Amino acid sequence: MIGVPVTAGPEEPGRRPGDASLTMRLVSEAADLAPARQFVRATLGGWGLADQAADFELAVSELVTNALSHGEGEIDVTVGLHGDSVRLAVGDEGFGPDPIQFREPTTTGGGGWGLRLVDGLSDSWGAHREPGRTLVWMERRLQV
């Protein structure tokens, strides 16, 4: 997978001064999660939040794995700082199930745990589809 920095994320309703959002586009060439994890770690570290990066690295691994397994095309990873919360979003060009639901986890195939982990790591999470695009996000308040 090759990671290409995009830029600051699109303007979002309710965005306040001091909020920040960065996006990286991943071009799928292999199932290598390292660029996504490094992007999350570097972004949060740049905002002085390196001590909180581990959980977001785990979450981005799960969300990108889902995008590789169930989506298509390029994958965008966005990390946003909004007030006292960090938001992580992963979008792909596929058509995920609507609504996205938990799958029964398996002990043999290793599948079905990703969204459960994201649920446990976040204060809130969700997913939505747009024409030709699926976006899954999680949000968590900063730990003080």
Segments and roles (model prediction):
Residues 1-23, 68-144:
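Conserved beta-strand-loop-beta-strand hairpin that lines the nucleotide-binding pocket
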Residues 22-38:
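STAS-typified acidic loop motif
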Residues 24-26, 48-50, 100:
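A short, structure-level motif marking secondary-structure boundaries and short turns
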